[in-house]
Amino acid sequence: MWTFPDYIPGQLPDWQALERRFSWFADMKDVPQDPEWHAEGDVFTHTKMVCEALLQLPEFQALDEQEQHILFAAAMLHDVEKRSTTKSEIENGKERIVSPHHAKKGEHTARTLLYTELAAPFAVREAIAKLVRLHGLPLWAINKPNPERAVIAASLQVNTEHLAMLAKADVLGRICCDQQDILLRIDLFRELCEENACWGKARTFASDYGRYLY
């Protein structure tokens, strides 16, 4: 079984050990976030809060040990590339802090780190990388032009139940005024997946060709 270093299921992470071990984690310190969406502070603080929120979820605690290590790794890495994408811009006359495409870039970084530093086997590596890439989807799926297609397509790449857990922890691990509204969006994501037969599993198709066309 693959395990994430310095993490033991059922115990709080050793944050100091993780910071010493991983430069990419230490890099998150002092990377700013917009205070309207992340009043808790920098990316380092947020990442720790997300991981600790994840560990408290009953649905996370019900997973097997391998799945817990996969999700913990995804939580650690979900904002890894905010360090390289964060910038200030003016929006409607107000300065905002944004991190465009951090999830897309983070997927590639996560895959590389999991191969070079963490010796994750292929299936584990891809599961984590895709969780990083899609971690924001449960928050925005309902606003997509075609929400059904969005969740079905996601289910072909990632376990949507695990994705919802990561998104829930991401929301609980921040301080913002619209937290309950965002959590409702995650509930709607689950309903959308259930209605389209892709909650916690890949949507099945009548044939491989049908899946390819989709």
Task: Please identify what each model-predicted range represents.
Residues 1-97:
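Acidic/His-rich, divalent-metal-binding segments that scaffold phosphate/diphosphate chemistry
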Residues 6-9, 114, 142-147, 198-212:
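Charged/polar, low-hydrophobicity segments characteristic of intrinsically disordered regions
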Residues 33-39, 48, 54-55, 82, ...:
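Generic local-structure boundary detector
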Residues 1, 61, 157-167, 171-214:
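Charged substrate- and nucleic-acid-binding regions of tRNA-handling and nucleotidyl-transfer enzymes
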Residues 59-177:
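Divalent metal-dependent catalytic cores for phosphoryl transfer on phosphate-bearing substrates
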